[in-house]
Amino acid sequence: MINHNIISFKKFEAIFEQRPGGLELNMPIEIGSNNVDLTSKPFNIKGGSHYKVKIGYMASEPITDLICQIHTFRKSTPYGRDTQKVGDICANTNDLEFDFPKFGWEQASTQSSSMGDYTIKMYFKGNGNQDLATFFYSFNVAPDWENALPIN
């Protein structure tokens, strides 16, 4: 069970090393929620492109040993797992950011068999492995930017 009101999310950005139409893609979220699910609004990535995500959040109480467990699914099938340590967080901190990956870039596969839908499920845990928040998002990998750019 998630302990409410300790972590609240503020923003979500997908950042690209190169992308026609801008390097940043901001996705609207419900500010103040500790359970964000953007899986019904996937963004698009060209195969082979480098990207990372940035999640803005705030903490209302101190958090010890904050970690983020990241589960990747491809078409609902488990595809990979990662854990990223964040560390200790002070109470009443408003301008925190979580970058994934922490260093460098992720790269979308260029193999045709890897094109398609992906879902990332992030579980934020701290204070003795207590569930604090969840953040889910999805994206599609396409063979070229023409098919990858969002339709507005």
From Swiss-Prot:
What keywords is this UniProt entry annotated with?
Answer: Cytoplasm, GTPase activation
Compartments annotated for it: namely: Cytoplasm
**Superkingdom of origin:** Eukaryota
One example of the protein's molecular function in GO is: GTPase activator activity
Q: Give GO cellular component annotations, separated by semicolons.
A: cytosol; membrane
Q: Which residues form a coiled coil?
A: none
Assign the protein's first listed, main location to one coarse class.
cytoplasm
InterPro entries documented for this protein: Ig_E-set, RhoGDI_dom_sf
What biological process terms from GO does the record include?
Answer: regulation of Rho protein signal transduction; Rho protein signal transduction
Q: Which family does it belong to?
A: Belongs to the Rho GDI family.
Its biological purpose: Regulates the GDP/GTP exchange reaction of the Rho proteins by inhibiting the dissociation of GDP from them, and the subsequent binding of GTP to them.
Q: Give the protein name, as stated in the record.
A: Putative rho GDP-dissociation inhibitor 2
**What's the source species for this entry?**
Dictyostelium discoideum
